[in-house]
């Protein structure tokens, strides 16, 4: 099931000009993820598969890799769900009011959330990244230590033995120039990450953020010139001079660990995977002497939700 939520202020012009923007390509590292069943020793196997969903209307490509870890020496089964794909940026002009005023919709945040219904026996036991991330790049290799726990090695080592642990075939990696990752209040039933805009240098000026303000020029985050003789729609910063996430979108790479009691009477679980894009409204207008910018936060939210079914006995995940 795919759903879409757009706040009531969304205009018809915005829907027509932005939502049909094609989805950016998925990360090429997907080809390195091995599917099938692997014996990692100590009476333990890892079974990996993948599921792909395209939501063209919202510009979202969801690719979910899942790995069942069956350790016969442990009383719980484990499932690692890795959420990848691309959430398109959709940075573009959406309105023009003559030559002196224009609006730009731009992605101020990207979100990925996983939710188990409250009545499910299964629980979320871990997640990666486990903390907020403010570096440009995040990388972590997931390993299993034959103790019922999956851990992440942030040094990014790939494959084989890592200390006393064994790689389960997943090295998380994503980039977020000018953005930062915030872990959103995880519980045993839900976890989410918000990759939110931090600040950006505009043509060697700034840095500017969503709240920057100058008494004369206002917010200059996406202002190409202060006094240029041009239409307002032509005075927005070129996408290739801004963060790549604005034009190309964000390619998430998060992991969630779910545990299930082997003795539970019901060995099936439902889980919802939700991708979101939040957009701000950046406006430019001519004051008679110069350009002035304003930024309205969180004006539009685009949401795509998919329910997956987990079969712990068959070690399968379907949608």
From Swiss-Prot:
One of the GO biological process terms: cytolysis in another organism
Cellular component terms (Gene Ontology): extracellular region
Transmembrane parts of this sequence: none
Pfam family, one: Leukocidin
GO molecular function, one term: identical protein binding
Role: Alpha-toxin binds to the membrane of eukaryotic cells (particularly red blood cells, RBC) forming pores, resulting in hemolysis, with the release of low-molecular weight molecules leading to eventual osmotic RBC lysis. Human RBCs bind much less alpha-toxin than do rabbit RBCs. Heptamer oligomerization and pore formation is required for lytic activity.
Protein family per UniProt: Belongs to the aerolysin family.
Subunit structure: Self-assembles to first form a non-lytic oligomeric intermediate, and then, a mushroom-shaped homoheptamer structure of 100 Angstroms in length and up to 100 Angstroms in diameter. Interacts with human ADAM10; this interaction is required for toxin pore formation, disruption of focal adhesions, and hly-mediated cytotoxicity.
Entry protein name: Alpha-hemolysin
Organism from which the protein derives: Staphylococcus aureus
